[in-house]
């Protein structure tokens, strides 16, 4: 019955369908068993039980305890724990304080806490999605309008919306009055969308073009409407994005994977070497206790205890440097990951472009003008055929500019030297170009006050205003009438309503040939990626306007405007090409516009195809994999398209950075190896899903961040070379002691920890601030799958470790024999302190040599004064361990004579001399 309240049972509700935009309003009511008077409270309660609350559901993640427990799954930490237990048991058995065991346990716990702090940062992207929901909504139930919590909405509810409301669920419009909705967070399109209830759209229309539907999380800017809810909670478009977000699994970064493999190699190698040493010791008749001490020391020596902390500091330093270059790193490992990027997928608007519409071409019947200038700054030149002209000398131009300034609802605002607009960017550009010609838009609007208007709508595709001509300006043609009607909008539609045109400073009849010439000029602008507007006018005897008045118009001309590329982006794209990085444009904009901007920036070339979202949807995985190898520009894409593009690139071994600013971008940002959100225009959801935020929304900043990432990775390789080369030297030195029959372990676990944390750690921190190689962005990206030992690093560590240990073993034998001669005041066990000191001092020379492939004398000290300071400080700390009594007792060292110290210094210099000689030979050879 007409006007009846729906009271259908729960079983009467039909299954949800996918294409609500393709149904009529009546068909939607039938599908949902709903009515304009709303559901009854009973039916709503039944449906709430069936569909659940209108909320986003979060999957359970790892608990903090689970994250902490996972840190102890590291094989190197497990080995250190075993060493601590055995060492502590031996000390307690002998009645000694277990200082070695306690020191090792402290290191293990600190490393675990450090890992926990890096991993425990909860994902907040879903929380940000939830924050987009309004708490209350106006709904019609039991034929009565009422407010209910958003969570209580169900399919079939009739919601009532007006300006300022957030859309609480996905819904099909049933009534609308001048309804405009901001969907940029969901679709990426900046302009408000005109919504109409009485449309029936094709089934394959993308979300951004579903003008008869509303989507959860979007905002009503203007007008009012009534809509029928068809999806709630996780069934909405926002819920689909939440599902995609939670389906993307976080993977370890390349550095984390390399360090895991490094741990496996080091532990395996150490265990094999320990087995060999113990086996040989047994054959030589040595005691198990001595061999156990050797094994414990070797296990501690091979583990680079200070490496996690040094890497964290290096990444933090990189983060600070990136902030200075306008990029904020949200996840520390992303700093190094940037250095592996092989492909950058960038949005167009605001990232590659200025997000400011600029009029660049103007066509009148008699002239074609080119306009220069940047953004909304009212400064630039007008040119004809490349020659600068005076705008005021061309009446056709001035009348056209005046029409654009008057038929306009925007405002041009100056704040110091910064210019911006309030209102629609398209209209703002018309004010700017008028101001470039010397027209004061505000002043012109005062002398031509608006009397009436018909606003722009997506159906009319034009805007009309009637102004009173007070006779105080020459920028109109009164023709004896007190008012003038100005019209702007779709060139084709306005041209159809014109009978005359303004040419040769006078009115002329609009012939078929002239119409064709105007349309051809508009098509040329459109093919260059420009948004084209047509302008016309008609003197009027009355101040009112309706659609019947928009006839018998006089054509003024065309203006072509574009969101101009950022001037620095062309160079950034070129730098990417030199660095072996591919740049792709992925945008929701029109294919012609996207292609024109991409060609201008050097991203693509003439003849290269553009792939649209519709074409992409029709492709299977294999077809898409083939397409992404050659396509650089993607237009009219939806969120799932971005995700598919990223996944396809990753399947082919690409390491992908993806930019985004909307809610719709969040799944792709999370899936990408590096998700890059926009700091100015980005939503909270996109920022929480990202690894990095661009503070200036600028593509060039991504390239600068990639450069910093490469520098950080290069420095990490330097101090890994330094630390592990030294550790291998320590390991081989310790292993040789029982084989040489020296009767004692040359280094205690505590002394080894000192070397690994302090002697290695302080210079390694200084290596982390090494400046980058100027040619670093002229090389191809390093393979993210490469081993930590790749490009000669593994052979370097082995070579240096062997040479280092050879020098130290010779010193150890000499020192052992030399110190057995009794001398007053000197302990015969000081040979162990001499080995300890030689190893520490030799590592200082190693740190100086490892910073560059150039000879040290060719590398200026001023480029990294921190390294020299760290060497001096570490050497002084080592001497304190040797000569300060409390430290002697704690670390088990003995005072050295001047001769002892001179011998240590002499042997420690041998490694530095060897490394410099190796570099000299390499330079001579190549």
Swiss-Prot record:
Q: What happens when the gene is disrupted?
A: Hypersensitive to osmotic stress. Mutant lacks ATP-dependent calcium transport.
Catalytic activity from the UniProt record: Ca(2+)(in) + ATP + H2O = Ca(2+)(out) + ADP + phosphate + H(+)
Residue intervals on the Cytoplasmic side: 1-63, 121-259, 310-716, 769-788, 853-864, 920-926
Q: What does this protein do?
A: This magnesium-dependent enzyme catalyzes the hydrolysis of ATP coupled with the transport of calcium. In vivo, probably exports the calcium from the cytoplasm to the periplasm and the extracellular medium.
Provide one Gene Ontology biological process annotation. sodium ion export across plasma membrane
Q: Which family does it belong to?
A: Belongs to the cation transport ATPase (P-type) (TC 3.A.3) family. Type IIA subfamily.
Query: What's the protein name?
Result: Calcium-transporting ATPase
Protein location: Cell inner membrane
Q: Where does Ca(2+) 2 bind?
A: 300-301, 305, 756, 760
Q: State the activity regulation.
A: Inhibited by vanadate.
Extracellular compartment ranges equal: 85-99, 280-291, 737-747, 812-832, 884-898
What sections of the protein cross the membrane? 64-84, 100-120, 260-279, 292-309, 717-736, 748-768, 789-811, 833-852, 865-883, 899-919
Which top-level group of life is the source organism from? Bacteria
> Which residues are Ca(2+) 1-binding?
727, 730, 759-760
Q: Which GO terms describe its cellular component?
A: plasma membrane
Which EC number(s) does the record attach to this protein? 7.2.2.10
Tell me how this protein sits in the membrane: Multi-pass membrane protein
Q: Which UniProt keywords apply?
A: ATP-binding, Calcium, Calcium transport, Cell inner membrane, Cell membrane, Ion transport, Magnesium, Membrane, Metal-binding, Nucleotide-binding, Phosphoprotein, Translocase, Transmembrane, Transmembrane helix, Transport
First-listed, main subcellular location of the protein, grouped into a coarse class: membrane
- One MF annotation (Gene Ontology) recorded for this entry: ATP hydrolysis activity
* Catalytic residues of the enzyme: 347
Query: Which CDD domains has this protein been placed in?
Result: P-type_ATPase_Ca_prok
Which residues are recorded as binding Mg(2+)? 661, 665
